[in-house]
């Protein structure tokens, strides 16, 4: 097996820095990310029937995902502020989990995978927040609630 040493573009002499993208061309870019939250059967039924105390779980999670995408550079230090030209948020209810897919588009100098990942993460955290009273056990903990499989599904450039 041959190992190729890779260098990190955001680290120079052990100092983190934002990469200069001034010379890059503006091109159409897209990233799609996904993840899921595992919930109890009782909570899943409340989501299905629209009886969650805090309100519409999916509507709230969609808005939260959009806001998170737009705020990504405020929470990820080396992420560039780029114009977001489109955001799609899809939430689906499964047997024991809710899945989220966030697609982000831009015409810019750098990709939008961090924005898509941030959108998915915040959508799932918002679902958790909306249903946490139903998910808590008698000690106030969440023994079965689990966010998992957050990943980039696709990234396109050009």
Swiss-Prot record:
E.C. number(s) listed in UniProt: 4.6.1.17
Record keyword Lyase present: yes
Mitochondrion listed as a keyword: no
One matching Pfam family: MoaC
Example of a GO MF term: cyclic pyranopterin monophosphate synthase activity
Binding site for substrate: 78-80, 114-115
Catalytic site: 129
Coiled-coil residues: none
Keywords from the named record: Lyase, Molybdenum cofactor biosynthesis
Reactions the enzyme catalyzes: (8S)-3',8-cyclo-7,8-dihydroguanosine 5'-triphosphate = cyclic pyranopterin phosphate + diphosphate
CDD domains membership: MoaC_A
Pathway in which the depicted protein is active: Cofactor biosynthesis; molybdopterin biosynthesis
Enzymatic class: lyase
GO biological processes: Mo-molybdopterin cofactor biosynthetic process
Its job: Catalyzes the conversion of (8S)-3',8-cyclo-7,8-dihydroguanosine 5'-triphosphate to cyclic pyranopterin monophosphate (cPMP).
Family (UniProt): Belongs to the MoaC family.
Subunit-level organization: Homohexamer; trimer of dimers.
Name of the protein this chain belongs to: Probable cyclic pyranopterin monophosphate synthase
Organism phylogeny: Archaea, Methanobacteriati, Methanobacteriota, Stenosarchaea group, Methanomicrobia
